[in-house]
Amino acid sequence: MGYLELKNVNLDQHLLSRVEELYYNSFPPEERRPWNSVKSLLKREDIRYKIEVIQQNGKFVGFISSWDFGSFCYVEHFAVESSVRGNGIGAAAISQFVAKSQKGVVFEVELPHCGEMAQRRIGFYSRNGFDVHADFEYVQPSYGEGLSSVPMLLMSANMSDDLKISVVAKTILRFVYGVKKD
C-alpha cells in the first residue's frame, strides 16, 4: 500500500481543488454543502472544522472533512479516489484518523435499504470498528433550498460510555446544520 499520511489542508493549497473535485464526484447534492460554504468554514477560526487530505506516497488519494467537538469528532465527508479503492487505503485512513483524534468518532451513513452502496458503506465502517446506532432515529437536515433532508444512521467508534448518542446528534444538528432541537 505504501506510506499513508493525513495532512491538514487550507485555502491556499492547490490540494483544495482536488478535494473539491472528489467531493462533487463522491456525494449527491442533498449530502453536501455548497463549496463556497466549505471554503467559508475553512476561513473561520472560531469553529473546529477542518479538511485533511489523504496522501499515499505524497499523492492525493482522498480526504476527510470533520468537526472536533471536544468529546467527539464528527466526520462530515470521507472519500477515496475510485482508482485506489479496494486497496486498504480507506481502512488505513480511518484507522489513522481515529487514533489521531483520541476520542469518539461519528459518521452519518445512508440507511441499508437505500441500496448496495449503502450496505457496503455500513459494512466497511463496521469492519473498521464502528457500531451502528440502528435504534436511534436520525435525519440529516437539508443543506439548502430545494434539497431534501436525508434519513440516515449514525455510526460511532471509541465513544465514551457516558456520551449519549442523542447528545451527539443534537450537537451535530446544532453546530453543523444550524438546527436547534430540544
Task: Name what the model sees in each region.
Residues S101-M117:
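Conserved GNAT acetyl-CoA-binding A-motif
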Residues F27-I51, Q55-Q56:
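Active-site rim helix/loop that mediates acceptor-substrate recognition in acyltransferases
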Residues I122, S126-G146:
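Conserved catalytic-core motifs of GNAT/GCN5-like acyltransferases
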Residues V80, G86-A99:
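Conserved acetyl-CoA-binding loop-helix of GNAT-fold acetyltransferases
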Residues V53, K59-D68, F72-A79:
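Conserved beta-strand in the GNAT
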Residues M117-A118, Y138-D182:
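C-terminal "cap" of GNAT-fold acetyltransferases
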Residues A91, A118-F124:
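Charged helix-capping and loop-helix junction motifs
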Residues M1-S37, P151-M152, V167-D182:
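Short amphipathic alpha-helix that is part of the acyltransferase structural core
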